[in-house]
Amino acid sequence: MAAAAAAPSPSFSKTLSSSSSKSSTLLPRSTFPFPHHPHKTTPPPLHLTPTHIHSQRRRFTISNVISTTQKVSETQKAETFVSRFAPDEPRKGSDVLVEALEREGVTDVFAYPGGASMEIHQALTRSSIIRNVLPRHEQGGVFAAEGYARATGFPGVCIATSGPGATNLVSGLADALLDSVPIVAITGQVPRRMIGTDAFQETPIVEVTRSITKHNYLVMDVEDIPRVVREAFFLARSGRPGPVLIDVPKDIQQQLVIPDWDQPMRLPGYMSRLPKLPNEMLLEQIVRLISESKKPVLYVGGGCSQSSEELRRFVELTGIPVASTLMGLGAFPTGDELSLSMLGMHGTVYANYAVDSSDLLLAFGVRFDDRVTGKLEAFASRAKIVHIDIDSAEIGKNKQPHVSICADIKLALQGLNSILESKEGKLKLDFSAWRQELTVQKVKYPLNFKTFGDAIPPQYAIQVLDELTNGSAIISTGVGQHQMWAAQYYKYRKPRQWLTSGGLGAMGFGLPAAIGAAVGRPDEVVVDIDGDGSFIMNVQELATIKVENLPVKIMLLNNQHLGMVVQWEDRFYKANRAHTYLGNPSNEAEIFPNMLKFAEACGVPAARVTHRDDLRAAIQKMLDTPGPYLLDVIVPHQEHVLPMIPSGGAFKDVITEGDGRSSY
């Protein structure tokens, strides 16, 4: 049997229409070429073409997941997958596990081997379908799986051994849960007979990760592997996406079995709690509220990442301005005239002004987190609130809405658009005066920065990158000031272009996430905008981008400090430095550590730029150089991310001036 660690939490019961998963029927990834395996010496007899693999991926709807306890038909089986094993041929549990991944459409994994997962790695070498991108640390592997999932919409897969290998996944799993990222993590475990004996490298990873996964499994019967893998992918991407962990004891991996691929999923409780289609009467009520309002604002978050087209159509029909959360960037084009860019602690003045002045707040795919709302009682205090979210636990958790719908945002927007289109000509929606009021705020309080001599303002570096890439690159970041500047100054055009650790704020995320994006979307320009503090936390992944020849570009904004903490020290602790200087105290004139030497050690081309006049050419060279590249951009540590609403503050407390050169 497979011992499920916990039933999927009701708080993660979601609708299935936009991101569900069932065996071999997954979201299309039309631009991803089949991975090359240069080191395979004895490929198995089956060779599937990329077209065959990707043609099996399709988007789920309610109708094709509603009957999860029925057997898969013979027609479905014939269409979805052809095994390299004969139907009655026994094979190891590890081979069953790898084939189960293949049947789910997996073509890339991020796996680091160890004693308890060796069997899985041996099975991976027998696969002609799955490429393993070897990270240099398990945290790099789980963050890469996240980057892959965030960039493609397809669940990322990471694999680690037991004990320290498994515990090294913890930050990535917590990050994926908070940011609703679909990943499947597989861990090796000590043999069943040794569980609970404090065996070498034994860690109860199911217990450790119970509160930071959407669901997890300890597989105690080899025959359960096909069902468990199928359920894991289904859970990871249905409803509100999230991480699922599968813990597989080593003796289960070694056991011979003839798998039953027709096992039904066993998720009756989860299925019964999924949201229904949006209530049409409630949608009509929302349209009525819009027609009655004078100052409506859209507040959109990561929950809108799958419904960008519907969102754009809704804005086109209503003329309502759009403010995005950090996780919502790209769902609506930042450069659009109706975009207010990002709201919240480091959001634009005009976005926060709009929310503060609004009489109707349309909150779509958001959770009213503290970095957006600040002081809850003061947030949108004049507005009626409409909250639509796929997670029922988020509705009313932080802010009580006037109207709420627990539904897939895509379906809700389709319903709203249909109603609006049917009333076109009858509804007289005119918010031009409101938009003009916001334009005044845009002109009065634009995003801006100062220059000092020939030093490179970090904001300017991102502006230049945006210009040279035409706003079309996939951007990953670490966490800190550089992250906020990347959110403010790069103009995101579409979803899955912006990869950042939002809820957890995990430093070290940027480079591994860029690796995942480069693997999943190899035809795109991928740039990791990083800080020296974040970058060095997973600097070992330079070896990965070199060995895998991944064209990841790293633009390092190097200020020799933990910049965001320094900013808070400047503002609230009288600039008292408490272990935030990352350079060499005995020689502050040198750049320490020398990031170029890290790159050189891994064979990655690198350069340093210190003068503003040299920056554009340096960034262009980075973009033009084939393969990976590191550009070390030296920036002043006195810069502050502005605007800033202090933690727990309200819009009236916004800070728009000053930096570390001043006293407070």
Swiss-Prot record:
Entry cofactors: Mg(2+); thiamine diphosphate
EC number(s) given by UniProt: 2.2.1.6
Entry keyword set: Amino-acid biosynthesis, Branched-chain amino acid biosynthesis, Chloroplast, Disulfide bond, FAD, Flavoprotein, Herbicide resistance, Magnesium, Metal-binding, Plastid, Thiamine pyrophosphate, Transferase, Transit peptide
SUPFAM superfamilies with a match to the protein in the record: DHS-like NAD/FAD-binding domain, Thiamin diphosphate-binding fold (THDP-binding)
Any one GO molecular-function label of the UniProt entry: acetolactate synthase activity
The keyword Metal-binding is annotated on this UniProt entry: yes
Region listing for Disordered, in residue ranges: 1-51
Biased composition regions of type Low complexity, renumbered to the chain: 1-34
Binding, FAD: 240, 346-367, 389-408
Disulfide bonds: 158-304
One of the GO biological process terms: L-valine biosynthetic process
Binding sites annotated in the UniProt record for Mg(2+): 532, 559
A Pfam family assignment: TPP_enzyme_N
Residue interval of the organelle targeting sequence: 1-91
Reaction catalysis annotation: 2 pyruvate + H(+) = (2S)-2-acetolactate + CO2
Pathway assignment: Amino-acid biosynthesis; L-isoleucine biosynthesis; L-isoleucine from 2-oxobutanoate: step 1/4; Amino-acid biosynthesis; L-valine biosynthesis; L-valine from pyruvate: step 1/4
Top-rank lineage group of the source organism: Eukaryota
Residues the entry annotates as binding thiamine diphosphate: 138
CDD domains: TPP_AHAS (cd02015), TPP_PYR_POX_like (cd07035)
Residue ranges, annotated region (Thiamine pyrophosphate binding): 481-561
The family this protein is said to belong to: Belongs to the TPP enzyme family.
Record's protein name: Acetolactate synthase 2, chloroplastic
Record lineage: Eukaryota, Viridiplantae, Streptophyta, Embryophyta, Tracheophyta
